[in-house]
Amino acid sequence: MDASPRSRHRRRKSSAHLARLSRSRPRSTPEQIRDFRLNSPRLRLISVWLVLVAGMLGLGSRLAYLQLVIADDLQVIAQEQQAIQATPRTSRRQMVDRQGNVIAMDRVVYTLYVHPMLFKKPSSTIAQSISTVLGLDPKQLTRKFAAEESGIQLSTDISEETAKRLRGLRLDGLDLLPSPKRVYPQSALFSQVTGYIDLEGQPKAGIELALQEQLSYDDPKVGEPTPLQHVTRDDLQMQLTIDSRLQRIAQDNLAKTVAEYGAKRGALLVMDSRTGEILTMAIAPTYDPNKYYDANIEYFRNWAVSDLYEPGSTFKPINVAIALEDKAITATDLVNDAGRIQIGKWPIQNVDYSTNGPRGPISITDVLRYSSNVGMVRIMERLPRANYYEWLEQKLGLGDRTGIDLPGETNGQIKARDQFVGSEVEAATTSFGQGFSLTVLQLAQLHGSLANRGKLVTPHVVRGLTNAEGEITWAPERAAAKQIFSPETTRIVLDMMKDVVNDGTGSAAKLDGYQVAGKTGTAQKATEYGTYGDQRITSFVSIAPVSDPRYVVLAVIDEPQGENAYGGTVAAPLVKKVLESLVVLEGIAPDASSPSSRQQQQQPDANQN
């Protein structure tokens, strides 16, 4: 059906109107068309979405790269930035005594570092939490946190229990760094033997220093810059020859003696003459290696090993053995004790000359029993001085070290050969233990040869590294035993020394049920100018039991005060106390030949009819 005339008229009118508008509007240029398209709202929206999608794709790919490809490397870098890189400390093996009691050990302690840059809670809140565990001032902690972003050291020497409490706070930014700390459970009991480890983890004395290589082992977990770790141990431990039980008895009684006589210092050694094992090495005054920084630096030195002194009369038995071995005397000889003699321009007299005067002809045994200086001069005069010097230097090794496995040992000192051989007085003073010097340890070693049938052994405090089964996997090398006296000579000398204890200057060391050989010593101390002053050094050396000689016990007290301070009054009673414990701990049966034992055997049993 055709459109109505009106409709056709409207279309013609509309077309005409559009034609007029078209003729009146200027035609759009290509640039205008492009601008129109770019400014289209829809197009702008699409562009924004495209940019966002591209960014998200780029970010996603980057995250994937970081998390999947180089995640491990980034973790290492982060740990290096956030953890504290401390100097690694080498772990150390335990030290134990001859019974396996722990003497030194490692314990894990922690150092707390704080990194405020990693806090997820307010600094004041974290400071308050830490202060409740460590007892620190929270206000001061807050100020510290504000001053630095990372690596603040708050506390050291934190125990495992305290470290556990800190971990329980669950705070970000805390870093507990473990390290081994050397601990000495028995405090000052072994300090001059063990030595100590300083705050930097370095050995400074004793076995810790001497056997650094054997005591230390590398633990790769200790010292790494990771927040939490633990210390592992191997099963090796360093076993010493020291007996903790006897050491404590000796140390306690030595300290009492030093205090009672106002002495400068004291030393007490117990040595097994057959093996050279040192059962006791007590020194007074001493120090606690756990708190070495509080001690007098003089106490760090083991003066029984490092310091020289003139042994005095305790060397007389050694001289008698030399004279017997060199055939200069026999056991039945007599010498004239005039009480006072002149050697060149030097007068020599007995300590008791003012009260006892001359004794006249006396036996070699009585020379030792009464500790006669004049008698010893007459004995050693029978030995050519060249021979005497050869004995001292070559056979006894007075100018050498003993070879003990402790640091700081000092060589003994004797005069040059020409000076000794060419001077009558040098041999005379050496005969009663003056004019030369040695260590306390070397004197004990020499008396050990008398107890060990003439064999000189190397004294030592270390048995070696032992494993969990008790097997020795490493031991120090030691010189072979050296025969310096014949067994017959040592038997004769011990019989003489026995009378010193039974009926002589060493009677304070007499032990019920046992025959003890001994010798007292009271020597004037040489001054720095080479003369002798008023100070003295007193000592007593014993060998027990005489029937089966084995143990040497030597006590030396330096500069005791008082008119009655002699070897027989100061050192001999101290040795007796140690001997009483020694025979019990070592299970030494009573000597049947001792007077008290014979009395006990003859006494009837009260239960018998």
Predicted features, each with a name:
Residues 151, 225-266:
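Conserved, well-ordered alpha-helix/loop/beta-strand core segments that scaffold catalytic motifs
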Residues 2, 8-20, 37, 43, ...:
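Small/polar-residue-rich segments within soluble enzyme cores
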Residues 60-85, 227-228:
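Aromatic-capped interface at the extracytoplasmic side
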Residues 87-91, 261-265, 459:
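Short, small/polar residue-rich loop motifs at catalytic or cofactor-binding pockets
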Residues 81-86, 110-119, 127-131, 148-156, ...:
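Second-shell loop/turn segments in exported
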Residues 25, 104, 225-226, 272-313, ...:
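Beta-lactam-recognizing serine transpeptidase/beta-lactamase-like catalytic domain environment
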Residues 25-54:
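Membrane-entry signal-anchor segments at the cytosolic-membrane interface
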Residues 90, 106-111, 115, 196-198, ...:
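Short beta->alpha transition motifs characteristic of CBS
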